[in-house]
Amino acid sequence: AGQHWLMTLRLRPVHGQLNDGGFDSQRYALAQHRPLSGGIVAASALDARCSLRARYLTSLTRRLQTYPWRAVMLGLGMGERLSLPTEIKVLMQNTGTSHLMAISGLHIALAASLIMLLLRGVQYILPGRWIGWRLPLLAGLAGAVGYAWLTGMQPPALRTCLGLAVCCALRLSGQRWTACQVWLCCLGAILVADPLAVLSQSLWLSAFAVAGLIFWFQWLPLPAGRWRWPWKTIIALVHLQAGVTLLLLPLQLLLFHGVSLTSMAANLLAVPLVTLLAVPLILTAMLVHLSGPEIVESLLWLAADRVLAVLFWGLRRLPDGWLTLDARWLWISSLPWLLVMGWRFQSWRHSP
């Protein structure tokens, strides 16, 4: 990657097969800004030097040769999913955890948060006039953009950076916006910057998930209780995952023609392990790989590898939960939305 080539190409517009229920390759290609397909007739290298990202990726690949879960670590850290074994891809698809392998909001927001917390911690030793919230906020945004570039600036990563930039601008403006207004502003900014994103399934999955969570926490919030840690954290995680699982059913059925019956259990295991352990360890190891002690880097990679081993051990113990459904189930899958609204309005008290 990063090389410059002079090529003679034979190109044609990309097209799909138009099979009902099949994968729409034309829509996917246009969403990825690849409207043409074809073959190479002749090629000659103008500049054979690889980009900085490609050299860093090559160095990481050599460093991880001895770890069993190196392909997953490269996928989580750099967004490289081509080397993932087919078995792992099928397992994550059947358990509804494929979203964890995409460099999107989860990873980039986590990287930005780590940079913000690091800079905020450094401010404790600085004079009072140098302490403020704006510098860590902007540093987190810059770190998010840098990490997105390092992972290849894929469309989901680019959309996340645009959303973070909008949120930072709103925060710096000092105005108070509701969650729905922020959601609409971020979605509008993404579509203005990339109109072809309207064809992307990943955009609508992300947007629908965020809208569903806003709806879930506003219409069916977790009741205040006297739970203590760790039960309070566990109940909050179950409440969050239940909302995502139930409210995304209509869109999953519409896009993928099926649902995963084990997705909630799988995500209850996978999301904490990946978010709180695997990804922070991988990001720290990637940073230490640049100049840190080799023994520290080895320990970080080993810890991340063992966390992933535990994760996939648990996922393999789950039954095959993928259930193929047709469009007749679409209205039934919308019942969670209707039930939440009915509960909120207490409509049974007013019904005859």
Residue map of PLM features:
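Membrane-interacting alpha-helical segments
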Residues: R53, L57, T61, W231, ...
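Hydrophobic alpha-helical transmembrane segments
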Residues: L46, C50-S51, G79-E87, T151-A157, ...
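Membrane-interface helix/helix-cap signal primarily in integral membrane proteins
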Residues: A1-H99
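C-terminal regulatory/interaction regions
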Residues: I295-P352
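N-terminal secretory/membrane-targeting helices
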Residues: A1-H4, I40-A48, L52, L76, ...
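Hydrophobic alpha-helical transmembrane segments in multi-pass membrane proteins
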Residues: G38, I88-M264, W329-P352
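Hydrophobic alpha-helical segments of membrane proteins
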Residues: Y67, V72, A157, Q241-H257, ...
